[in-house]
Regions:
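N-terminal "arm"/small-domain region of PLP-dependent enzymes with the aminotransferase-like
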Residues: 13-17, 21-78, 209
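Active-site phosphate-binding strand-loop segment of PLP-dependent enzymes
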Residues: 57, 157, 161-213
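Short loop-beta-helix segment that forms the pyridoxal 5′-phosphate
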Residues: 85-91, 99-123
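Conserved PLP-anchoring active-site segment centered on the Schiff-base-forming lysine
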Residues: 124-143
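Short, structured coil segments at secondary-structure junctions
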Residues: 131, 151-153, 207, 238
Length: 401
């Protein structure tokens, strides 16, 4: 018992040292609870009323009454949970309906649901690829893609972010592989850049590779009808596999999916470990997901409102003198470069009633610190102007503008 106790203390002291180093480097993350539903107008646990400019709530559906009503109805009709994985007794008719609805939205063959997009990516690569195959991955892909690749025995190649010359070089280097899969985010979440899927699919055809896109920051609002980054580039028919989420624009609860060619989805149902060994998506989330997709299939009103809001804020924030990353996406990185300044600006903006977060190394490269603003269709013009006024005041205070 004494030796076990010594071992425990050694582990605890080691972890304390790591936490201390994280704090000393200014990288310690602090959660700021809110006491209201997720929306544009939120209330912090301190009772402060603020405008939320940092949520993935792109279409303003997180607290939409139609989704809430759909979830409540599903609770009454289908119950709270399934207490099972899909292949035992965890598949209800609404799970198949949501999969069919997603397939229709993407015009794909079939769809498989997961607890999250992280799980969808985690269960993708090791299922489809083996040691004689190769993955060519963008250097700025999401952590879930990186972790999913780590679980796979395939050869690994990486190309510079959105760099088509480097991608082609890696495709040439990997020509000994039997199957080659190009993996990319549809939108890179720290910069708001949309992947060059038109050029990626051209290279994939040239070198006989398949293409996988994680469209979590695009599904529902990028492209003229919100079908995502592939629609934006007019290459919907050239993507083999999409992964995405219900946890951002589509209500923001949880749940992910993989959609694409039938043979890929069939194999995932048989062998994808996160799918086989995780509980089924809850009926309430499933039903609300169906409702969200049907809303977006009927009208582009929310997507169009988001586009209008994004263009307005990008134009006005640049006009104030702030440096932002160029683009069209509602992710708008406002550059401070200095990590400490980013944190101070975020704190000052909170006092002005604007809830944003500073991002810095290791989330972004060193000396690339920023405030990441995320625009929503739920924002009114007065919301946007209030934020712009606050940014102007704080920007002048810290000599950013």
């Amino acid at each position: 018992i004494r030796e076990l106790w010594k071992g425990y203390l050694r582990v605890v002291n080691s972890f304390k040292k790591i936490i201390s180093e994280i704090k000393d480097e200014g990288l310690y993350k602090v959660e700021r609870p809110i006491s209201s539903p997720q929306s544009i107008d939120i209330v912090t646990d301190k009772g402060l009323n603020v405008l939320n400019f940092c949520a993935n709530n792109y279409l303003g559906l997180a607290n939409h009454p139609d989704l809430i009503a759909s979830a409540k109805q599903a609770l009454d009709e289908y119950g709270f949970g399934m207490a099972s994985v899909r292949f035992i007794c965890g598949t209800q008719t609404i799970h198949k309906e949501l999969e069919d609805t997603i397939s229709q939205f993407f015009n794909s063959d079939d769809t498989i649901l997961y607890s999250s997009c992280f799980d969808a990516n985690g269960g993708l690569f090791e299922t489809l690829l083996g040691q004689n195959d190769a993955i060519i991955s963008d250097s700025l892909n999401h952590a879930s893609i990186i972790d999913g690749i780590r679980l796979c025995k395939a050869q690994r190649y990486r190309y510079k972010n959105n760099d088509m010359d480097d991608l082609e070089e890696q495709l040439i280097n990997s020509q000994n592989a039997e199957i080659r899969l190009i993996a990319t985010d549809g939108v890179f979440s720290m910069d708001g850049y949309i992947a060059n899927l038109d050029l990626i699919t051209t290279l994939a055809k040239k070198y006989d590779a398949i293409v996988m896109v994680d469209d979590s920051h695009a599904t529902g609002f990028i492209g003229k009808t919100g079908r995502g980054s592939a629609e934006y580039h007019n290459v919907m028919d050239k993507i083999d596999i999409w992964t995405s989420t219900l946890g951002k624009a589509l209500g923001g609860a949880s749940g992910g999916f993989t959609t694409g060619r039938k043979e890929f989805i069939d194999l995932l149902r048989q062998r994808s470990r996160p799918y086989l060994f995780s509980n089924t998506l809850t009926p309430a989330i499933t039903s609300a997901g169906i409702k969200a997709f049907k809303m977006l299939s009927k009208s582009t009103e929310l997507r169009d409102k988001l586009d209008k809001n994004t263009k307005y804020f990008r134009r006005e924030i640049s006009g104030l003198g702030f440096e932002i990353k160029n683009g069209e996406h509602p992710i708008i990185p406002i550059m401070t470069y200095d990590a400490l300044i980013a944190q101070k600006v975020a704190s000052a903006l909170l006092k002005e009633g604007i809830y944003v977060i500073g991002f810095f190394y290791p989330v972004v490269p060193k000396n690339e610190a920023r405030i990441r603003v995320q625009i929503s269709a739920g924002m009114s013009l007065s919301h946007l102007d209030q934020a712009l006024d606050a940014f102007k005041k704080v920007g002048e205070k810290f000599n950013i503008i």
